[in-house]
């Protein structure tokens, strides 16, 4: 059942789109661009050629049209009714770069894979960024959510973020202005991150390589890296590990439709082949219910759920009461 009308939305933008150099796709299948390989259509998907093209598009986009920004498609779950409005997917050509930006500093485009930042740092003897080798996704998302691994978080290495707002105005946010906390930033949600500046410290390349190898080996041993998964499903509650709570609640390997909580790492939700957005979200809410009933702790989603439900296939979020 089609829930969006991309051609109509595209036509409403008028002649201004003729000057846009990036790719505009009406009714774009989101299951082709998300790591879960599930979900409905984006009413309109836009992939800007570069930052100037992005700004030009934003200036012709009416304020009432919803705008959803995605990265490489990790850490998101798209609902089966699709995403109304415009989905902005930054292009690798314009936003996938990574380069040196001074002594022990690296500048990366928002769509640059996290592991490419780690590799650039290693090649140039810059320590402190090796942890990105074990984080799936892109740098823009890592900056937005304060991604971390192996005891290190983005906020420890980030200097500033370059961004544009909904009207196409440029902004620079310092580390302090990002307002970081665990897996969260207080940066305005309407800002579109375009690049991120990091600073590390001098370190022997062989040592960095060893650290990266340890990160990779650990990840491949304990995480379902070859499955259709969006990464960690839930945040770790204070003083607890989400995976342990899920395991103790008996949800390791739990299956709903085509979705499963991984038997290898039970805080990873996987698409076993034909899972729908409904299957995945229903499974997540069921796990939240089971953990609360057995452990008295309410898990919070780390995966972002985007879009609208198909009529008759809504998933009611578990409310519960946060334990004291």
Swiss-Prot record:
Write down the chemical reaction(s) this protein catalyses: UDP-N-acetyl-alpha-D-muramate + NADP(+) = UDP-N-acetyl-3-O-(1-carboxyvinyl)-alpha-D-glucosamine + NADPH + H(+)
Biological process (GO) annotations held by this record are: cell division; cell wall organization; peptidoglycan biosynthetic process; regulation of cell shape
The active site annotation covers: 183, 232, 302
Q: What is its EC number?
A: 1.3.1.98
Alphabetized, the UniProt keywords read: Cell cycle, Cell division, Cell shape, Cell wall biogenesis/degradation, Cytoplasm, FAD, Flavoprotein, NADP, Oxidoreductase, Peptidoglycan synthesis
Q: Does the keyword NADP apply?
A: yes
The UniProt GO MF terms for this protein read: FAD binding; UDP-N-acetylmuramate dehydrogenase activity
- Intracellular or extracellular location(s): Cytoplasm
Cofactors, names only: FAD
Q: Which residues form the FAD-binding PCMH-type domain?
A: 36-203
Pfam families given for it? FAD_binding_4, MurB_C
Q: Name one GO cellular component term.
A: cytosol
Note the InterPro entries from the entry.
FAD-bd_PCMH, FAD-bd_PCMH-like_sf, FAD-bd_PCMH_sub1, FAD-bd_PCMH_sub2, MurB, MurB_C, MurB_C_sf, Oxid_FAD_bind_N
Q: Kindly tell me the pathway this chain contributes to.
A: Cell wall biogenesis; peptidoglycan biosynthesis
Q: Into which family does the record put it?
A: Belongs to the MurB family.
Known role? Cell wall formation.
The record's annotation in PANTHER family points to: UDP-N-ACETYLENOLPYRUVOYLGLUCOSAMINE REDUCTASE (PTHR21071:SF4)
Instruction: From the Swiss-Prot or TrEMBL record, give the protein name.
Output: UDP-N-acetylenolpyruvoylglucosamine reductase
Which species is listed as the source? Rhizobium etli (strain ATCC 51251 / DSM 11541 / JCM 21823 / NBRC 15573 / CFN 42)
